């Protein structure tokens, strides 16, 4: 079973395909296998990699809460790339993985060919409410275990869209979630989810980001919609895709639309055709051209 040793923690990874590297970073309620619809599609064109975050078996589940943080999540992406002797890669993350992808780009821009940041922003509009909700879920992981808490989490307000559209796909998602580690999820939520900075607090750093970036969100993923628009406005090299009637797990809920949007983006980046936003498109008037 392939493992990358990152700061003494073993991270399980999977690979498929050849070509330019494309690494996938999973969400809180997923793991590397959550990217199978993308791995099967993109491995025809790219060297695809996906890994289980720390806390997600068969990756190690460190007991020390200090082993889990937002920066560590970004560093783990770098660690997997280092293990595979990959200098630069396209990086695609969802939710928790989207945050990690953004922070990877901010911390190690020289290692990123592009960033695909999907479903990122939860907690930014109401940080205190986010912390309260997280405490509820953490206590459930610690007292009720993975089966009951995972099922509870899978019925969240941005998950029910998937349940309605594709009950069989949603059940696969739910079954994969409840097979995880309650301890790992509790530690991850406490160390990463609860303590990460809001998207809005990253404004100054995002305005300096020159890595080509694609932001993807579902229009019914309420906690991520406004942060997605904010990122589009602040990252000068970014584009925004909003998928209609779609919740949080955009890569699973709408795999064809997600794959097509990401492929079009990667094709433009690889061809050198994804550029910064034109300054004259930022004129205050919606009609009058910017002064020359």
Question: Where are these predicted regions, by residue range?
Answer:
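Conserved alpha/beta-hydrolase catalytic His-Asp/Glu region
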Residues: 126-132, 143-205
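Flexible "cap/lid" loop of the alpha/beta hydrolase fold
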Residues: 102, 106-107, 112-145
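Catalytic active-site module of serine/aspartate enzymes centered on a nucleophile-bearing elbow/loop
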Residues: 238-292
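Active-site loop/oxyanion-hole signature of alpha/beta-hydrolase fold enzymes
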Residues: 40, 49-92, 96, 260-263
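Short beta-strand/loop motif that positions the catalytic acidic residue
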Residues: 209, 215-217
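Acidic beta-to-alpha connecting loop that harbors the catalytic carboxylate
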Residues: 18, 219-221, 245-247
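Conserved HGGG/HGGXW glycine-rich cap/lid loop of the alpha/beta-hydrolase fold
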Residues: 7-66
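Conserved alpha/beta-hydrolase "acid-adjacent" motif
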Residues: 222-227
